[in-house]
Amino acid sequence: MDVFMKGLSKAKEGVVAAAEKTKQGVAEAAGKTKEGVLYVGSKTKEGVVHGVATVAEKTKEQVTNVGGAVVTGVTAVAQKTVEGAGSIAAATGFIKKDQLGKNEEGAPQEGILQDMPVDPDNEAYEMPSEEGYQDYEPEA
């Protein structure tokens, strides 16, 4: 029985030593894991901040580009609409065809929207002067 007890004692010492080594190993591994997670987190944060700043800058550039294209497109559509309305008015007899597209002096009339200054980088747009408008008086 003495041999049995001695064997159990040695086994116990071995288990304690293994547990101690395991505890030390786990603590060391946990420390390294924490360092790794913090490092990855800090690099990810830097990357996210840089990425967000880059995306914000690119978005601003694209909005400026798209804004200019939209203003130009809207101006072109509006001009075509005015021209189309003039053609319809002439076709239906509201105005004479020889008056279509001419001002009071008989010169070709520029589109009202073409006289409007368009600056896509500037948020304030000026309205065209009242001189660009003509009063419409239907023929009776």
UniProtKB/Swiss-Prot annotation:
Any Gene Ontology biological process: synapse organization
- What are the Acidic residues biased-composition ranges? 118-140
Question: A Pfam family for this UniProt protein?
Answer: Synuclein
User: Residues bearing Phosphotyrosine?
Assistant: 125
Query: What keyword terms does UniProt attach to this protein?
Result: Acetylation, Cell projection, Copper, Cytoplasm, Membrane, Metal-binding, Nucleus, Phosphoprotein, Repeat, Secreted, Synapse, Ubl conjugation
Q: Name one GO molecular function term.
A: identical protein binding
Gene Ontology terms: cellular component: axon terminus; cytoplasm; cytosol; extracellular space; membrane; neuronal cell body; nucleus
List every stretch annotated Disordered.
Answer: 100-140
Record carries keyword Repeat: yes
Modification after translation: Phosphorylated, predominantly on serine residues. Phosphorylated on Tyr-125 upon osmotic stress. Ubiquitinated. The predominant conjugate is the diubiquitinated form.
Q: Where in the cell is it found?
A: Cytoplasm; Membrane; Nucleus; Synapse
Source taxon at top rank: Eukaryota
Q: Name the segments for region: Interaction with SERF1A.
A: 111-140
Question: Which residues are in coiled coils?
Answer: none
Name positions with the PTM N-acetylmethionine: 1
Q: Which residues carry this modification: Phosphoserine?
A: 87, 129
Name the residues that bind Cu cation.
2, 50
Q: Where does the UniProt annotation place the signal sequence? A: none
Say which family it is in.
Belongs to the synuclein family.
**Annotated function:** Neuronal protein that plays several roles in synaptic activity such as regulation of synaptic vesicle trafficking and subsequent neurotransmitter release. Participates as a monomer in synaptic vesicle exocytosis by enhancing vesicle priming, fusion and dilation of exocytotic fusion pores. Mechanistically, acts by increasing local Ca(2+) release from microdomains which is essential for the enhancement of ATP-induced exocytosis.
- What does the record note on quaternary structure? Soluble monomer. Homotetramer. A dynamic intracellular population of tetramers and monomers coexists normally and the tetramer plays an essential role in maintaining homeostasis. Interacts with UCHL1. Interacts with phospholipase D and histones. Interacts (via N-terminus) with synphilin-1/SNCAIP; this interaction promotes formation of SNCA inclusions in the cytoplasm. Interacts with CALM1. Interacts with STXBP1; this interaction controls SNCA self-replicating aggregation. Interacts with SNARE components VAMP2 and SNAP25; these interactions allows SNARE complex assembly and integrity.
Name used for this protein in its record: Alpha-synuclein
Q: Which organism is it from?
A: Macaca mulatta (Rhesus macaque)
Q: Please spell out the taxonomic lineage of the organism that makes this protein.
A: Eukaryota, Metazoa, Chordata, Craniata, Vertebrata
The record's gene field reads SNCA
